[in-house]
Amino acid sequence: MAKPAKPNGGAVGRNPERTRGRILSAALREFAANGFAGARVDAIARRAVINKRMLYHYFGNKEHLFREVLRRKITERQSSAEGLSGDPAESLPFWFKLSCRDTDWVRLLEWEALQGGGKKVIDEKSRRALATRALGRIRKQQALGYLSGEFEPGHLLLAMRSLTTFPMAFPQLTRLFTNRSVSDPHFQRKYAEFLKKFAAAFRPAVGRRNKTNYEN
């Protein structure tokens, strides 16, 4: 029987970008499983098959590593939305389907809420800037007639985030309310259809299509 690979900082370190990617992927799994407070650097190093010294060489400390994990995930999600129209009837099903595939992102946010409450979050300045841009897109959607102008943009954004992530964040309630597992393809298909109809039903006026990315 082959022996499991041992952490090897030297061999892996010959390709810095590859090593960095392995660390970030391992850290994502560890943070998603245990949250920031519960994640252990030695566990991340084992997942990445490197030694702790090399991990600290690349990222300094656990907080810096968590910040990079968040930035990487946000960049990935933004890239996946390129070309997405500003119509919520299209964007809501898209973000729901993405959340079904990207449950690690949902878990990261859940752990952050459980462990941090309403306190400042890691990398708050950059994330607040992203939120400000998202609110700007909500206002544009209101101006184009996709969303009612009578609601505050922040409330609309919060509701839209909830609609697209709640089933994955609370799978037990999804099962109790629908008699379906969130991983059930039938549920995913029907809920995506619901989101499309829901967004269309609450449209105050016929808005013209606007090919502006809507990042989640």
Labelled PLM ranges:
Residues S79-R107, R127, P153-L157:
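Hydrophobic alpha-helical connector segments
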Residues Q78-E82, G118-L144, G154-H155, R189-E193:
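Amphipathic alpha-helical packing segments from all-alpha helical-bundle domains
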Residues A33-A37, D102, L144:
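Short coil/turn segments at alpha/beta junctions that flank glycine-rich nucleotide-binding fingerprints
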Residues R71-E76:
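Short, basic, alpha-helical segments at the C-terminal edge of helix-turn-helix-like DNA-binding modules
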Residues M1-K6, F94-R101, A131-L144, S162-N216:
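C-terminal peripheral helix-coil segments that are non-catalytic and often amphipathic
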Residues C100-V121, F170-T178:
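Amphipathic alpha-helical segments used for helix-helix packing
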Residues R22, A26, E30-H64, E68:
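Helix-turn-helix
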